[in-house]
């Protein structure tokens, strides 16, 4: 009896109709109807991109079938009721971004379905629903913690009333600040108190302005976006050279307040010390900030690119756009909290005497030691000038240089202009502050062995290594990136260029800052400005290179000189960052300093010798996106400064882990200049070899010469090729997925061919018992790998191996089966690299081109069973099918093929093999020849390995079939359920290939003409 299909909205019951169906795992997939059974009332559903063996019959009224697009029952009625759209084209609105926050945008189109096409303030165009668009209000806070910039200044009105209102608000703000200006002078005469009082002082100073100022500032910043056109041509332009040096610290102090949710006393505190010059500075700063853009979450790379471009216009043209883009992956630990706690910087600089008054009795005794150290330093300044990265020891002694000694114990309050200059200089030069931002300063001296402390409030954990702190922060506190661990002295002196890069709160270093900032001449301002820009454009501190370990101990006093001169030339910066910790003669007399705000001890001098190499074991995970978005001053590594910005485009990470990520300790090959993760290569900071070449440059056997340059073939891994400029559409960009999928498929086929070649060589050994390589199989395969090869499925050595002195093994590409002594196995450290690695992720399954030649076949099958038939005649026919090892167990251990040498497999062999070998054993016993018995065991071991490889080849062939299904689903056939006949398209294909060859010939001729 023929049934009629039901009338289901959105589903047409005909062959080829598109719909969605739910499989037995309760997942919904796009599918189409393959067949219809009108007798049973069922439809055969084919899930797209799945094999036809997964086709399933559904009743046509099944709830597990649904239309592709969800039915919008009320959409039409709602639109008819609405009538006109709420917003018009070119209207300024607030549109919801993917982070569920509203950002300024402009309506570019009103769609018929009730959606709006909007262009966000940073240029991103997106279609949003009407419920995600609301009216733009200039007086409201757009986002709680992230107030974006407003780029569409033309659409904002600038009425005279608002300008007058803005001026009145600004005058009121300045009056409040002037009332608070004398507060530091009054508090300087307070008696000595615990360090927590320093924080109270800082908060008291900004208490009044804390309530009134931030609101005014927010309104000012919103209003100034309307008036920046008028003010850009006013007197503020004339004062720009004078105030340029002040703008950046102000800017840095304000941005984190909103971005990180800092207390609102941060900006008022900074404003207190700058009150005299605030009025002209504020407008100029805000005008510049709006043109540069306040950072907004999730769009930070785009804004950073804009900020770097603006700075390039002001200073020089050599900044690359992708510096900002690659900045987050390159920046390391140093300087993570330079901007995070600006209130600490302000409290240190504004309260000169309170800074000293709040020092504990421990600090007094340390000052006495410093005075004696000062007298000794007058005799020999070179002896006591140390790199600033040396922790408190260096900080306590570096004051003794003659150039700095004159103002060592300076405690008199400075003028607001000088204090303003100090703030700017500290923000420009003190690029990395390594203070502990949380904690009290009256804590006892910490054990010198503990170098890394958890920065979470109320957590008192200390760690000896950066990676331990990293794990603690990630798994105990649930923070992906830790706040800022204290770094080893070696790391400090390598990564530091600022005057107090390690001891910002200490009084001595503060005095040094004052010396360099006490003469606010135009020349110094220009130098500071120039240096700030130079540090900004070099935003990519490189991971440690092996060479640094040998050349670090150079000219310990050069940083002192560079700090006072503020010259931004690359050689000087190189000298600054290369100051070595081994030249610190007065380490024993350097006191442990307490900063009034931190209270943690910076100098871990005792462990200096053992840690001067551990410079980057925790570099990458400390730069969060919030710091990345800010306009911070960062320095760069000396190797990078010498080489210039040209190096940025040519630095390549090529590691066996296949992860294009720069983190932790990295080492660079001296030949190919590629970087590898130290932990992946089994190298730590302590055991860096004198001469290092990567595994690729060592020309391992079986590797093609072009393998060294695989990383340059992005068109293979990403599918993007360079096209001709005059073409509007690039073919590779349109078909990138197809190119990549095809390349992966070819790579898998090539790997299977290589493994099959190795299997043929092994089976040639199995053909005769007199083969010279047969004794190499006296032990089962993988006898070696019981302990150390737990992740060895990803390491090249994949073929025959035994316990003898000269076992055979398959070469890197699996194609050569020439037995050789196992003299060059991969190091144990390499094998265990992902056990002890700091990478907190599982290694991705990468396709070709992979760095290491892993075995690409994984499970059972019988692709080459016919070739093994001669062996089945020898009595092994009962063994071969039954000794397919339980590969799932082995795979759970991380190995690609079974390990008959492991204890479980041995037990398995003893239980399984020996009873079933009974017929052959009887024959051998009759002959009484021990040689035949041993030969049979050798063949048995080899046969076991061959069968496991055959199984894996079959499994890989199944996966290749799936890949082919995916590629076939991308064919541009029209309407049919099956792809067109390939032979029908053969003439067209030939013609295309001929045309392509002709075009390539022309391109070759053009290239020859151009080269000659």
Curated annotation (Swiss-Prot):
Source gene?
PHF20
Q: Which GO terms describe its molecular function?
A: DNA binding; zinc ion binding
Which residues does the record list as Phosphoserine (modified residue)?
159, 488, 878, 880
Q: Which GO terms describe its biological process?
A: chromatin organization; positive regulation of DNA-templated transcription; regulation of transcription by RNA polymerase II
In which residue ranges is the amino acid composition biased (Basic residues)? Answer: 539-551
Zinc finger feature spans (C2H2-type)? 452-477
Tell me where in or outside the cell this protein is found: Nucleus
Q: Return the protein name.
A: PHD finger protein 20
Q: Which residues bind DNA?
A: 257-269
Annotated domain remarks = The Tudor domain 2 mediates reading of dimethyl-lysine residues. The Tudor domain 1 doesn't bind dimethyl-lysine residues, due to an atypical and occluded aromatic cage.
Where exactly are the zinc fingers annotated as PHD-type? 654-700
- Give the UniProt tissue specificity note: Expressed in heart, kidney, liver, lung, pancreas, placenta, spleen and testis. Not expressed in brain, skeletal muscle, colon, ovary, prostate, small intestine and thymus. Expressed in colon and ovary cancer cell lines while it is not expressed in the respective normal tissues.
- Pfam families reported for this sequence: PHD_5, PHF20_AT-hook, Tudor_3
Q: Is Ribonucleoprotein a UniProt keyword of this protein?
A: no
Q: Lineage, please?
A: Eukaryota, Metazoa, Chordata, Craniata, Vertebrata
Task: Write out the GO cellular component annotations.
Answer: cytosol; histone acetyltransferase complex; MLL1 complex; NSL complex; nuclear membrane; nucleoplasm
Q: Which residue numbers delimit the Tudor domain?
A: 4-69, 83-147
Recount the PTM note: Ubiquitinated by TRIM26; leading to proteasomal degradation.
Identify the SUPFAM superfamilies for this entry.
FYVE/PHD zinc finger (SSF57903), Tudor/PWWP/MBT (SSF63748)
Give any extra note attached to this record. Antibodies against PHF20 are present in sera from patients with hepatocellular carcinoma, glioblastoma and childhood medulloblastula.
In this chain, the stretch annotated as Disordered covers: 142-336, 481-611, 866-912
Q: What is the effect of changing residue 100 to S?
A: Abolishes homodimerization
Q: N6-acetyllysine modification sites?
A: 843
Q: Where is the composition biased (Basic and acidic residues)?
A: 147-245, 297-325, 481-490, 522-538, 888-912
Explain the purpose of this protein.
Methyllysine-binding protein, component of the MOF histone acetyltransferase protein complex. Not required for maintaining the global histone H4 'Lys-16' acetylation (H4K16ac) levels or locus specific histone acetylation, but instead works downstream in transcriptional regulation of MOF target genes. As part of the NSL complex it may be involved in acetylation of nucleosomal histone H4 on several lysine residues. Contributes to methyllysine-dependent p53/TP53 stabilization and up-regulation after DNA damage.
Quaternary structure (record): Homodimer; disulfide-linked. Component of some MLL1/MLL complex, at least composed of the core components KMT2A/MLL1, ASH2L, HCFC1, WDR5 and RBBP5, as well as the facultative components BACC1, CHD8, E2F6, HSP70, INO80C, KANSL1, LAS1L, MAX, MCRS1, MGA, KAT8/MOF, PELP1, PHF20, PRP31, RING2, RUVB1/TIP49A, RUVB2/TIP49B, SENP3, TAF1, TAF4, TAF6, TAF7, TAF9 and TEX10. Component of the NSL complex at least composed of MOF/KAT8, KANSL1, KANSL2, KANSL3, MCRS1, PHF20, OGT1/OGT, WDR5 and HCFC1.
Q: Which PANTHER family match?
A: PHD FINGER PROTEIN 20, PHD FINGER PROTEIN 20-RELATED
């Amino acid at each position: 009896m023929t049934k009629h299909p039901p009338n289901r909205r959105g589903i047409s019951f005909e062959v080829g109709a598109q719909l969605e169906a739910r499989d037995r795992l309760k997942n919904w997939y796009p599918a189409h109807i393959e067949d219809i059974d009108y007798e049973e009332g069922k439809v055969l559903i084919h899930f797209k991109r799945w094999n036809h063996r997964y086709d399933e019959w559904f009743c046509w009224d099944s709830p597990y079938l649904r239309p592709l697009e969800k039915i919008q029952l009320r959409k039409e009625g709602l639109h008819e009721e609405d009538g006109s759209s709420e917003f018009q084209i070119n209207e300024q609105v607030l549109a919801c971004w993917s982070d569920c926050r509203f950002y300024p945008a402009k309506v570019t189109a009103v769609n018929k379905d009730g959606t709006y096409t909007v262009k966000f303030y940073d240029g991103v165009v997106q279609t949003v629903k009407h419920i995600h668009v609301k009216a733009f209000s200039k007086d409201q806070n757009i986002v709680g913690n992230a107030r974006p910039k407003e780029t569409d200044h033309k659409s904002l009105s600038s009425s005279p009333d608002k300008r007058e209102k803005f001026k009145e608000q600004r005058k009121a703000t300045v009056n409040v600040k002037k009332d608070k200006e004398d507060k530091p002078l009054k508090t300087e005469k307070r008696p000595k108190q615990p360090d927590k009082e320093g924080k109270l002082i800082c908060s008291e100073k900004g208490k009044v302005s804390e309530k009134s100022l931030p609101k005014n500032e927010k309104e000012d910043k919103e209003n100034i976006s309307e008036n920046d056109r008028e003010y850009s041509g006013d007197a503020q332009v004339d004062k720009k050279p004078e105030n340029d040096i002040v703008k950046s610290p102000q800017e840095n102090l304000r941005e984190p307040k909103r971005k990180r949710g800092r207390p609102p006393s941060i900006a008022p505190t900074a404003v207190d010390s700058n009150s005299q010059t605030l009025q002209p500075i504020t407008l100029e700063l805000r005008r510049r900030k709006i043109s540069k853009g306040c950072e907004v979450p999730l769009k930070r790379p785009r804004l950073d690119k804009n900020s770097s471009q603006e700075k390039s216009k002001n200073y020089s043209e050599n900044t690359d756009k992708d510096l900002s883009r690659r900045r987050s992956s390159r920046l390391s630990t140093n300087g993570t909290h330079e901007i995070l706690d600006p209130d600490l910087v302000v409290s240190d600089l504004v309260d000169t005497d309170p800074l000293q008054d709040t020092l504990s009795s421990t600090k007094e005794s340390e000052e006495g030691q410093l005075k004696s150290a000062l007298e000794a330093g007058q005799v020999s300044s070179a002896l006591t000038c140390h790199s600033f990265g040396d922790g408190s020891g260096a900080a306590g002694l570096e004051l003794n240089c003659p150039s700095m000694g004159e103002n060592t114990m300076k405690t008199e309050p400075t003028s607001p202009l000088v204090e303003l200059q100090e703030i700017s200089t500290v923000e420009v030069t003190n690029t990395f502050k390594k203070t502990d931002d949380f904690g009290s300063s009256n804590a006892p001296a910490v054990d010198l062995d503990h170098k890394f402390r958890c920065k979470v409030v109320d957590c008192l954990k200390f760690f000896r290594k950066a990676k331990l702190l990293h794990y603690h922060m990630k798994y105990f506190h649930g923070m992906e990136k830790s706040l800022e661990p204290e770094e080893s002295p070696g790391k400090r002196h390598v990564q530091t260029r600022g005057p107090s890069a390690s001891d910002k709160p200490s009084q001595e270093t503060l005095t040094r800052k004052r010396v360099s900032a006490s003469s606010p001449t135009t020349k110094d301002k220009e130098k500071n400005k120039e240096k700030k820009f130079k540090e900004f454009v070099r935003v990519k501190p490189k991971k440690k290179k092996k060479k640094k370990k040998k050349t670090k101990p150079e000219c310990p006093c050069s940083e002192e000189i560079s700090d006072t001169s503020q010259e931004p030339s690359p050689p000087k910066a190189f000298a600054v960052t290369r100051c070595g910790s081994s030249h610190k003669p007065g380490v024993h007399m350097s006191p442990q300093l307490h900063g009034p705000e931190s209270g943690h001890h910076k100098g871990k001098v005792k462990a200096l010798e053992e840690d001067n190499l551990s410079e980057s074991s925790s570099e990458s995970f400390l730069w969060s996106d919030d710091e990345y978005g800010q306009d911070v001053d960062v320095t760069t590594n000396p190797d990078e400064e010498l080489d210039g910005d040209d190096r940025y485009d040519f630095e390549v990470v090529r590691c066996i882990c296949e992860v294009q990520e720069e983190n932790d300790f990295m080492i660079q090959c001296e030949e190919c200049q590629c970087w590898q993760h130290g932990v992946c290569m089994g190298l730590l900071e302590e055991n860096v070899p004198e001469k290092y070449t990567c595994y690729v440059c060592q020309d391992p056997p079986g590797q093609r010469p072009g393998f060294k340059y695989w990383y340059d073939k992005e068109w293979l891994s990403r599918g993007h090729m360079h096209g001709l400029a005059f073409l509007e559409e690039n073919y590779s960009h349109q078909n990138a997925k197809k190119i990549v999928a095809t390349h992966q498929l070819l790579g898998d086929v090539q790997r299977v061919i290589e493994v099959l070649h190795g299997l043929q060589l092994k089976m040639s050994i199995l053909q005769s018992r007199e083969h010279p390589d047969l004794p190499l199989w006296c032990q089962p395969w993988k006898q070696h790998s019981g302990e150390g090869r737990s992740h060895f499925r990803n390491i090249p050595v994949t073929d025959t191996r035994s316990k003898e002195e000269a076992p055979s093994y398959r070469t890197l590409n699996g194609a050569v089966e020439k037995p050789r002594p196992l003299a060059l196995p991969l190091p144990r450290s390499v094998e265990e690299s992902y056990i002890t690695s700091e990478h907190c992720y599982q290694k991705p399954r990468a396709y070709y081109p992979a760095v290491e030649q892993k075995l690409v076949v994984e499970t059972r099958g019988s692709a080459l069973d016919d070739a093994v038939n001669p062996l089945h005649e020898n009595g092994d026919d009962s063994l071969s099918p039954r000794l397919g090892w339980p590969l799932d167990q082995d795979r759970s251990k991380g190995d690609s093929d079974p390990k008959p040498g492991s204890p479980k497999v041995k037990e398995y062999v003893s239980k399984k093999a020996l009873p079933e070998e009974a017929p052959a054993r009887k024959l051998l016993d009759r002959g009484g020849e021990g040689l035949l018995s041993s030969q049979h065991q050798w063949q048995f071991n080899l046969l076991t390995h061959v069968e496991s490889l055959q199984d894996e080849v079959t499994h890989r062939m199944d996966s290749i079939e799936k890949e082919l299904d995916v590629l076939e689903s991308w064919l541009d056939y029209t309407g049919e359920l099956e792809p067109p006949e390939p032979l029908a398209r053969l003439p067209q294909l030939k013609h295309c290939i001929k045309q392509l060859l002709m075009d390539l010939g022309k391109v070759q001729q053009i290239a020859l003409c151009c080269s000659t």
